[in-house]
Amino acid sequence: MQNRKPHRQKAPQTGHSIFGTILFSLLAVLAVEILLLTFAAHATRLGPQLNQNAEDILAMQVDNRSRYLQSIFHDAQELTSLSDTINGLTQQLLDEGEISLSTLDSSSDAAYPLLEAAAPELISTLRIKSVTGVFLILNTHDLDKRKQDSLLPAIYLRDLDPDAAPSQRNADLTFVRAPAQLVQSLSIATDNSWSPTIRYRALGNRGFLYPPFQAAYKDGASLAASDYGHWTSRSYLVPGDTHEAIAYSQPLILPDGTVYGVIGVELLADYLWENLPCSELQNNGTYFLAVTDTEELSASELQLRPVLRSHCDGQPGSADESLTLRLHSAHTRRYLFSNDLYIASVSPLDLY
């Protein structure tokens, strides 16, 4: 007799593996969690809070950059030591009969003793300050009566990389304006736009000569020279030059009140752009260095005239188009510009 093993019947297939069942359960749990997170974000207004955080970060970045730029400007415009030194040299040369105030601005030859004596002081100032240029322009007459395009004795020195270690022989400096005799004696190269004198272009308040000089001249030099100090509110180009710049200048005033010229410093757009890195701003942001006649920056509408702007494409530049920033909300830093909504932050530069 044979013993037969009982025949086992196969269990019916359900169509779902254990792995599929577990995966389905996990997906179901994940879906529930997503719904809960979405509800929580909506209930706690997480989106608006993130936007507010982004605006706060932008405001902090702009404020920090503003303070840094302000320190550069303040250092640049502190010219008291240079002014006192040149005034002392001028008075000494007057006492010795080497120069005359009546002819000082008539030619480079008449002014050469002073230009030669002042040149080392200008070079020293250029070395110790984070500026790209320094200049001295001599004039003893009313600019309102001076003919346009008349020539004035001047020195205009430039250092394209003021943060680099200086050359012992001044090989890193160039003369933009200076008498040929001075160029030869100091063995400093000339810029492509070099000229022995500077041309009076009658730019009025747009230039760096007229505003400080004429204010002191008309006022009888009743204030300190620094009180007439002036930053150009528009960028400029020295004739024949390709380097866009802004400048600070103040008058030269002798102890008897005689106004006989201006001294000043230059900041090239290239150098300022390096100190306005748009890479630190999110979403292809841009820095503007601008001026406004609006007294309160918290006003509902700001009319700004850009002086310079940074470029994320690697090129600095000026911006001729004015900006109108309208306050979008009393509680945010959103502004309307060109019918599009932008986030902007405005921080003042206290220069005077």
What are these regions (language model features)?
Residues 242-270, 309-352:
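Extracellular/periplasmic juxtamembrane segments that couple receptor/chemosensory ectodomains to their
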Residues 12-113, 130:
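Juxtamembrane extracytoplasmic/periplasmic/luminal helical "stalk" adjacent to the first N-terminal
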Residues 80, 122-123, 130-141, 285-291:
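Short, hydrophobic-rich beta-strand element in sensory/regulatory alpha-beta domains
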Residues 117-122, 262-306:
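Solvent-exposed, extracytoplasmic
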Residues 138-199, 292-296:
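GAF sensory/regulatory domain recognition
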Residues 1-14:
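N-terminal Lys/Arg-rich, disordered targeting/topogenic segments
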Residues 178-264:
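Extracytoplasmic/periplasmic ligand-binding sensor regions of membrane-associated signaling proteins
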